[in-house]
């Protein structure tokens, strides 16, 4: 994270992590398409001929909100994906460095269970090598490819979510379903963590719920931030007012 209090600007890094072909790049493409044009930059992708990410994808976004002091603040977000193939372990660690929050994109297909587990362990290992832990980094989990046959049932995913602390989202990124909800949850957890560590509410003059309402509008959900906040199983997203 980078803070410029004089300019009232915050820059953060979000990373989409997960096994190969779980839909990380598809999430970013859908996010780019669904976000309002004045809030998104150019999506940069570098793929091989078999549609696998070679190094990383990156999507720049900017969210603007009015402060209680009458000014405005900007949150600049760079959303990265990592290559899922085992041979790119060093690249994943490099991209993960400095991440303010992570979305783990799991493949819902039953046949991909072991790959999901191996990738999650890889995330834990890489964070440890970077001197961090899973407890230190805001995390959301997305089960993608819900439109395919032979996937984990909703009941199985719900049970898994209730046993964990992280919000779990269900998605079909290729159809744009669950993409905004997953990103909104990730952005909110990142903002809440940074606000707690750096007192952004006081220093920037904007409350988390105010900022997230503006972000929801930029994502095409004006006035519907509570709807987005309820789109997960387990975990928690937006704090209740007065809490």
Regions found by a protein language model. Give the residues of each.
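Conserved G1/Walker A P-loop phosphate-binding module
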Residues: 1-50
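Conserved nucleotide-binding/hydrolysis micro-motifs of P-loop NTPases
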Residues: 21, 85-86, 109-111, 145-149, ...
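Switch I (G2) and immediately adjacent beta-strands of P-loop GTPase domains
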Residues: 40-88
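Conserved catalytic network of the ASCE P-loop NTPase/AAA+ motor domain
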Residues: 51-54, 66-72, 93-98, 129-135
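Inter-motif core of Ras-like GTPase G domains
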Residues: 88-111
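Conserved C-terminal guanine-recognition region of P-loop GTPase G domains, centered on the G4
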Residues: 101, 108-164
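Canonical P-loop GTPase G-domain recognition
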Residues: 137-140, 147-200
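C-terminal-of-GTPase-core extension/linker across diverse P-loop GTPases
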Residues: 177, 188-243
């Amino acid at each position: 994270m980078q803070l410029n209090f004089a300019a009232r600007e915050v820059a953060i890094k979000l990373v989409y992590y997960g096994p190969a072909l779980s839909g990380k790049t598809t999430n970013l493409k859908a996010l780019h398409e669904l976000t309002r044009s004045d809030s998104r930059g150019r999506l940069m992708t570098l793929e091989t001929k078999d549609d696998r990410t070679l190094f990383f994808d990156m999507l720049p976004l900017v969210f603007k909100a009015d402060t209680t002091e009458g000014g405005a603040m900007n949150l600049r977000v760079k959303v990265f994906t990592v290559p899922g193939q085992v041979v790119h372990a060093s690249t994943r660690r490099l991209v993960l460095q400095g991440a303010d929050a992570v979305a783990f994109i799991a493949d819902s297909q039953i046949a991909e269970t072991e790959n999901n587990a191996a990738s999650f362990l890889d995330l834990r290992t890489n964070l440890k090598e970077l001197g961090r832990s899973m407890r230190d980094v805001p995390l959301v989990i997305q089960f993608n490819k819900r439109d395919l046959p032979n996937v984990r049932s909703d009941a199985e995913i719900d049970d898994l979510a209730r046993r964990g602390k992280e919000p779990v989202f269900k998605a079909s990124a290729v159809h744009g379903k669950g993409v905004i909800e997953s990103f909104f949850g990730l952005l909110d957890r990142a903002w809440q963590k940074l606000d707690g560590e750096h007192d952004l509410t006081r220093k920037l003059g904007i409350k988390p719920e105010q900022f997230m309402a503006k972000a929801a509008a930029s994502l095409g959900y004006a006035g519907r931030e509570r709807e987005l906040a309820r789109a997960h199983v387990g975990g928690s997203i937006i704090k209740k007012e007065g809490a």
